[in-house]
Amino acid sequence: MDMLDPGLDPASSATAAAAASHDKGPEAEEGVELQEGGDGPGAEEQTAVAIASVQQAAFGDHNIQYQFRTESNGGQVTYRVVQVTDGQLDGQGDAAGAVSVVSTAAFAGGQQAVTQVGVDGAAQRPGPAAASVPTGPAAPFPLAVIQNPFSNGGSPAAEAVSGEARFAYFPASSVGDTTAVSVQTTDQSLQAGGQFYVMMTPQDVLQTGTQRTIAPRTHPYSPKIDGTRTPRDERRRAQHNEVERRRRDKINNWIVQLSKIIPDCHADNSKTGASKGGILSKACDYIRELRQTNQRMQETFKEAERLQMDNELLRQQIEELKNENALLRAQLQQHNLEMVGESTRQ
């Protein structure tokens, strides 16, 4: 397939058409027509447009591959791919064949709404007459948005450009002889009927750091408004109040018991009623004092246990010495010896 990259005239919204033949057989020949349409006299300037590859299933011959790429991010560019027979190329027939429409716009900011207009038979034939697109009623049908870059089989991958121009593809079976598509930027949500698909390459899906727009809310949010209270709500409210009252009474009773246990607080409470905060503060001080006293008592108890063990060892030593002394006296008596201390006492 021959590649054709025409230069578009920025001063006018003229049509840039390119026709190429691929595997022309004895029965039919397929051509490609490329058109650029602006929104009006004030449409932004468009730059070069190239053809490479689009989904193969959209066209009759699966060996043909197309690619649409915009080198400028601004404005709106509409491409119309028309299958042309031999008779249409020679100007013998006015009826157009299967038509596939691909439109693109820079999805830079706001929400995009897809509208559908009708075209006559002249708009589908290659030539200058295809530049004018009269509007007409048409029924909505499913569409698919293909994010650039995309590839089809062995076609070269498109280069990623800032702005990420996207393509809305309408198959030939859904587009009739008198229909076309234009993309306009509006403030409303997408009004196209049917299902909405977003297809892109894995590199674009796994790419990190890119900001993605969230789908707008299709229905307005209605805040919950409380109506009149039912008897069931009143009964639950009364039960809740009763539970809270019992809980407060229990807390007050425990605080009164604390005031009676604490010595200083009990004396003060007899004179003037102490507050709950004062009672709890004195209770905390009393608990800290009890902990310190308990720690001192534990240390004293350990010391007493150590002294008791020492006394037990001394008592055992005294018993051993007494037994040894008794044995020595028995030996002296056997040898008829008198102890010096005993003779002196006598």
Curated annotation (Swiss-Prot):
SMART domains: HLH. It is found in: Nucleus. GO terms for molecular function: bHLH transcription factor binding; DNA binding; DNA-binding transcription activator activity, RNA polymerase II-specific; DNA-binding transcription factor activity; DNA-binding transcription factor activity, RNA polymerase II-specific; double-stranded DNA binding; identical protein binding; protein heterodimerization activity. Residues 235-290 form the bHLH domain. InterPro entries: bHLH_dom, HLH_DNA-bd_sf, USF. Its main location: nucleus. It comes from the Eukaryota. GO terms for biological process: cellular response to glucose stimulus; glucose mediated signaling pathway; lactation; lipid homeostasis; positive regulation of DNA-templated transcription; positive regulation of transcription by RNA polymerase II; positive regulation of transcription from RNA polymerase II promoter by glucose; regulation of transcription by RNA polymerase II. Residues 226-244 have a biased composition (Basic and acidic residues). The keyword Transcription regulation applies. CDD domains: bHLHzip_USF2 (cd18923). Residues 1-44, 215-244 are annotated as: Disordered. Residues 307-328 are annotated as: Leucine-zipper. Residues 11-20 have a biased composition (Low complexity). One of its GO terms (cellular component) is nucleus. Keywords: DNA-binding, Nucleus, Transcription, Transcription regulation. Pfam families: HLH (PF00010). Transcription factor that binds to a symmetrical DNA sequence (E-boxes) (5'-CACGTG-3') that is found in a variety of viral and cellular promoters. Interacts with MAF. Efficient DNA binding requires dimerization with another bHLH protein. Binds DNA as a homodimer or a heterodimer (USF1/USF2). This is Upstream stimulatory factor 2. It comes from Rattus norvegicus (Rat).
